[in-house]
Amino acid sequence: MKIINPILPIIENILGNLTALQAEGKITTQPIERVALQWYESERNILRKTTNTGREVAFRLLKEGQRLKHDDVVFISDELVIAIEILPSDVIVLSPKTLPEMARACYEIGNKHSPLFLDGDEVILPYDKPMFEWLQAAGFHPQKAERRLSQALRANSAQGHGHSHSHSHDHHGYHHHGDGHWHKH
């Protein structure tokens, strides 16, 4: 980490998990400041935020695969610890009962380019009312909940997407990718 001035450190590395660093004795009595992030901000490489005490912090995480998670520690000194807080958000939770049902759910959600998260046997995605209603109509049994989203599957997350395309929209919510197929988002 480089310090431009005493107010604005530039965070370039994730030092570890808060609980693990406390267990190792690297964090003892230092005050812990939190940087609150929405789930989608944790995917960004360059970001400027403010801690819960008003300290400005800038992130430049350029190493491949560096993604911020809840309770990541990004700064430690004798006087201060800065840790990440991923804020809970509204989500859709699916609990497929079989492997084919899981595969179909992931396939259909992926076709809609929605970020997808797995937690045990649950499929989780950010809440979106049209998506929720579509999942209900498709025979899934979605539940609305509040969760911390962390680490989207790389195959379909915004920064992990491996291709680009242009597309157009009509006035009824349908979407065209230039390949002769229209679908609704």
UniProtKB/Swiss-Prot annotation:
Pfam families: UreE_C, UreE_N. NCBIfam families: PRK13261.1-6 (NF009754). This is Urease accessory protein UreE. Residues 176-185 have a biased composition (Basic and acidic residues). GO terms for cellular component: cytoplasm. HAMAP family: UreE. It comes from Haemophilus influenzae (strain PittEE). InterPro entries: UreE (IPR012406), UreE_C_dom (IPR007864), UreE_N (IPR004029), UreE_N_sf (IPR036118). GO terms for biological process: protein folding; protein-containing complex assembly; urea metabolic process.
